[in-house]
């Protein structure tokens, strides 16, 4: 999963994940925002994980928009697709297919490659490295300096009905609500 700055081609954050699901994408996006700031907009493909209401809520809290690429239009995602091709040819191609490594080891090597190679290499479309171009625009980047604010942006929000005994269920766990007599039978928003 990767997020790329459209103008500079800087990878704001990327990592290999066991699954490409919403929670993995959310973690990568959160790290991208923590490291490189809040984007003006996020341009994604049509994948289910990018069309979720949760992503819309996260982006709304940060004050950025989400736009989805047209279906079956690979040109509209050319920059990120070109980056993935670069990962395959300049990073993954160096691996011995017989070598056993963990996901953590793979990501450690990947992060080093990103910072030491990809982010530093002069890009033919900009005549600058992605890092140099991005840093030249740094005064326009809205950083999140308070980790609590960042955590608040990325909280999941779901509705739950308070059971008669004053409990709610979230991810197969039961929680007792405050004021169970008042809230029993009512719907509440849960943030986690």
Feature names for model-found ranges:
Residues 30, 56, 165:
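Short glycine-/small-residue-rich flexible loop motifs, especially phosphate/cofactor-binding loops
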Residues 50-53:
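Short, well-ordered alpha-helical microsegments
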Residues 56-151:
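Charged alpha-helix within mobile-element recombinases
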Residues 118-192:
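C-terminal, beta-rich DNA-binding module of retroviral/retroelements integrases
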Residues 9, 42-45, 77, 117, ...:
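Short, conserved catalytic/metal-binding motifs centered on acidic residues
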Residues 1-34, 38-48, 69-71:
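A short, conserved beta-strand element enriched in hydrophobic/aromatic residues
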